[in-house]
């Protein structure tokens, strides 16, 4: 399983400025603000990375835009608490599986099936929630292919 964090944000201009302040360039690779603005302007699937320089740990930031899959997944996000002060919301595993299936279809990287198998083993996947999206996105055969892999 890859060691990165996928984050979906509804990022307006004010939040963009706060995001840039929260990740100092001395500690993180942060793309130039103009790149983030370009990604914000894309109607679907705007994306950029944040990388912690010391550890190499990466966050893939996906912007909601008008993507119907994001609109579906946002209310289903799961809230996690770390200590008393930190709460984050994470995407449902079905959303992550759908995105990884899309990326696998586009590039056939072996990491995506491995990640999908790990998600199925660790968190499980609600196939009744997944099936309509698999059909809508034309991913049903890839899903079956990955499920049948050893």
Model-derived regions, located:
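Compositionally biased terminal segments of proteins
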Residues: 1-150
């Amino acid at each position: 399983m890859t060691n990165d964090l996928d984050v979906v944000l509804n990022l307006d201009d004010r939040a963009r400025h706060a995001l840039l302040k929260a990740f100092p360039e001395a500690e993180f690779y942060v793309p130039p603000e103009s790149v983030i603005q370009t990604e914000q302007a894309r109607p679907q699937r705007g994306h950029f990375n944040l990388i912690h320089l010391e550890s190499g740990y990466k966050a893939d930031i996906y912007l909601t835009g008008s993507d119907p899959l994001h609109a579906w997944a946002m209310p289903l996000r799961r809230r996690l608490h770390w200590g008393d002060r930190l709460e984050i919301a994470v995407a449902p595993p079905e959303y992550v599986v759908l995105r990884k299936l899309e990326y696998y279809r586009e590039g056939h990287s072996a990491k995506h099936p491995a990640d999908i198998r790990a998600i199925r083993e660790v968190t499980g996947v609600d196939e009744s929630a997944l099936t309509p999206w698999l059909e809508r996105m034309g991913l049903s055969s890839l899903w079956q292919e990955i499920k049948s892999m050893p």
